[in-house]
């Protein structure tokens, strides 16, 4: 059964001072943990970098976690990712800076989005991170999204 989400209501209430595609506020410590998980997964697992790669990974069912930068300009570049992640039931988290996201992904330029495909040695940290993100989502009235392959 396909999930249908109305984009008008989906993007209705971003946190104050955040772009319209941000659905919940991520504390700085959780965002840093997400960048750390991405960095470890880059070294010991598998990641994808960039919005196009992230979109393909989610659509193909490969993504374990999607990281989306909050400072993307224009915001329409990544605006589809939260909606796509919700539809495909893939956990996602926002990080404050595309520069930090690019650095954590191991590239010398900024990245609007990145995806953990295989967490490698960050598997336990990834589970804890997704659990924490789901707690944040619950506080904002959003449903939990478990790790793919988990209930």
Curated annotation (Swiss-Prot):
InterPro entries in alphabetical order: eL8/uL1-like, Ribosomal_eL30-like_sf, Ribosomal_eL8-like_CS, Ribosomal_eL8/eL30/eS12/Gad45, Ribosomal_eL8/Nhp2, Ribosomal_eL8_arc
PROSITE patterns (UniProt xref): RIBOSOMAL_L7AE (PS01082)
Keywords annotated in UniProt: Cytoplasm, Ribonucleoprotein, Ribosomal protein, RNA-binding, rRNA-binding, tRNA processing
GO function terms (MF aspect): ribonuclease P activity; rRNA binding; structural constituent of ribosome
Chief place of localization: cytoplasm
Record carries keyword DNA damage: no
Gene3D superfamilies from the UniProt entry: 3.30.1330.30
Localization terms from the record: Cytoplasm
GO annotation, biological process: ribosome biogenesis; translation; tRNA 5'-leader removal
GO cellular component: cytoplasm; ribonucleoprotein complex; ribosome
Subunit structure comment from the entry: Part of the 50S ribosomal subunit. Probably part of the RNase P complex.
Role: Multifunctional RNA-binding protein that recognizes the K-turn motif in ribosomal RNA, the RNA component of RNase P, box H/ACA, box C/D and box C'/D' sRNAs.
Family: Belongs to the eukaryotic ribosomal protein eL8 family.
Name this protein carries in UniProt: Large ribosomal subunit protein eL8
The organism of origin for this protein: Pyrobaculum neutrophilum (strain DSM 2338 / JCM 9278 / NBRC 100436 / V24Sta) (Thermoproteus neutrophilus)
Lineage: Archaea, Thermoproteota, Thermoprotei, Thermoproteales, Thermoproteaceae
Gene responsible for this protein: rpl7ae
């Amino acid at each position: 059964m396909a999930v249908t989400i109305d984009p008008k209501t989906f993007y209705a209430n971003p946190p104050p001072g955040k772009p319209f595609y941000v659905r919940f506020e991520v504390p700085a410590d959780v965002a840093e943990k997400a960048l750390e998980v991405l960095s470890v997964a880059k070294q010991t697992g598998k990641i994808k970098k960039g919005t196009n790669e992230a979109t393909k990974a989610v659509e193909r069912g490969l993504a374990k976690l999607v990281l989306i930068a909050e400072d993307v300009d224009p915001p329409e570049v990544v605006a589809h990712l939260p909606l796509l992640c919700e539809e495909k039931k893939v956990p996602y988290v926002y990080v404050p800076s595309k520069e930090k996201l690019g650095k954590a992904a191991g590239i010398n330029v900024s990245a609007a989005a990145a995806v953990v495909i295989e967490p490698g040695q960050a598997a336990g940290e990834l589970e804890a991170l997704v659990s924490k993100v789901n707690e944040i989502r619950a506080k904002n009235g959003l449903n939990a999204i478990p790790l793919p392959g988990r209930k």
